[in-house]
Amino acid sequence: MPPPSLLLLHPRTPLPHHHRSSFRTSSPRPSRMVCAAAEGFISAAPILLPDGPWKQVEGGVTAAKGFKAAGIYGGLRAKGEKPDLALVACDVDATVAGAFTTNVVAAAPVLYCKRVLNSSKTARAVLINAGQANAATGDAGYQDTVDSADAVAKLLNVSTNDILIQSTGVIGQRIKKEALVNSLHRLVGSLSSSIEGANSAAVAITTTDLVSKSIAVQTEIGGVPIKIGGMAKGSGMIHPNMATMLGVLTTDAQVSSDVWREMVRTSVSRSFNQITVDGDTSTNDCVIALASGLSGLSSILTHDSTEAQQFQACLDAVMQGLAKSIAWDGEGATCLIEVTVAGANNEAEAAKIARSVASSSLVKAAVFGRDPNWGRIACSVGYSGIQFDADQLDISLGAIPLMKNGQPLPFDRSAASKYLKDAGDIHGTVNIDVSVGRGGGSGKAWGCDLSYKYVEINAEYTT
């Protein structure tokens, strides 16, 4: 259906700025930092950035120039008063890109965002609600999404098509639209470029998550400092090809629309599409990426320039950091599993093998049981759908080689079991390294162990 027509103000008209108090942290453990906006509700995930020519900075989605965010409680959750409405807004028309679920039963907000991005190259804000997925809700659910976008647009004095919507929660439930609309004036009034604004938004989008996921980095491209920030949610119903995970990325780099969309697709394929918790692909997966262009960096117009390659690597790092935090926070998990595959013919084949290992319920259960059962790893490599010479298969668990040239190696089983136990005791990382030949292709995937707690959480999710 055609979108309602609203007056679009000058693209450089700033949004309201309501400054809030600075972000405060308390850190009994580095991986469990408590933010002021989230205090009493949820802690922050560990920062799991890969190494590279960038530095971590504070601010999440508000780190980049031109962005504000807010998260409030609007009464959408079934119980409790944890924030459940988030808004990320840009002062200018931001170049927009998105990636969406492959589930055929796509939620109303996914269908809406895809329609908007098919006709628009820019956006001004992303509204996210937690509590109702608004999936499998028919025409009425879709209209709820349009009405929500329209209501936000009027408060921000922009077009309805400038607003994107994300939803997460119980499938089959429509948005509590009255509660949402009644909360929007307060939500818009809370918009802030502060760190607290970013972190309150990161908390508001969570559901069964035990931690919020927020990250920001700064790098220098062409002598100009640029920032990329992001937030994500996800803990269960996580499987490659986007799963119940929502993500919002922001940057002050200036990138042409076509290049930005290709960069986002590439980074998603190397990050969010490489995580798995339970093998379920959600109806609501959605990553939205906004580029304000306010850094002062000349526009990136091609994929193959040095500046584009530097920026792509930084974008990869931010998305991988968020993706790893999601896998780390897998429902009931005691550790993160990182699978690295080398020696494949190309990156795509290596990524598929890594995904196969990280997705294996038997591998995940073995890690939880602190059982160094390399046979399960070898099996999951073999059924990945990628052809390789089994006589060149190498497998290591941490620093402990388990298989070489397709043959099992003698190893200290108690040391290998202790390696798994130690990782679980501190909610650390279990590294599984696989080589399938001498090709130049490499890739990574991330998952988590599979515990009794996972069944308990999901058996009681709607009850």
Curated annotation (Swiss-Prot):
Protein family per UniProt: Belongs to the ArgJ family.
Catalytic activity: N(2)-acetyl-L-ornithine + L-glutamate = N-acetyl-L-glutamate + L-ornithine; L-glutamate + acetyl-CoA = N-acetyl-L-glutamate + CoA + H(+)
Binding-site residues, substrate: 207, 233, 244, 331, 458, 463
GO biological process terms held by the UniProt record: L-arginine biosynthetic process; ornithine biosynthetic process
UniProt xrefs under InterPro entries: Arg_biosynth_ArgJ, ArgJ-like_dom_sf, ArgJ_beta_C
Gene source species: Oryza sativa subsp. japonica (Rice)
Gene Ontology terms for molecular function: glutamate N-acetyltransferase activity; L-glutamate N-acetyltransferase activity
Remarks, miscellaneous: This protein may be expected to contain an N-terminal transit peptide but none has been predicted.
Chief localisation class: plastid
Family matches, as HAMAP family: ArgJ
Domain of life: Eukaryota
Site location (Cleavage): 243-244
Pfam families: ArgJ
GO terms for cellular component: chloroplast
Name listed for the protein in its UniProt record: Arginine biosynthesis bifunctional protein ArgJ, chloroplastic
Subunit structure: Heterodimer of an alpha and a beta chain.
Active site: 244
